[in-house]
């Protein structure tokens, strides 16, 4: 998935669910006005021993939620140990036909590069500059030709409080200091 598509998908979710917290508990029921409520659920991110199970590698087969078609919902997935016993069961989210759109695994995303400069003491400007590109012919993992600088990403880790946003609705964090249930609710 390209960054541009991921960004559009995220903002569609935010508008439809009226929340920045995509991992809020899933609720299939509409509110009294007919609007979506809740979020897509924690998905597989709440598995307590994911690292011990397989070192954080993906383990949900692609297409597990296909029964939902282009809909939105969750489908249970039993995580099976080598001996055949069930380790736990996770809920796999699907949003408008896209399986695990947010928060499943670290993902490679074309159309965005971050240039991380050394700190000022080390001869740089100390910034992490976000560059984006919407032309697949110009996608690059290391270059910036055809990319536009859209803002500076937060250098510190923490929960996202503000995103770059700008003219393109960028979703990369510019400020941390939020929480797991406040602001954007995602850890950077």
What are these model-derived regions, one by one?
Residues 1-152:
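Functional-site microenvironments in short loops/helix caps that host divalent-cation chemistry
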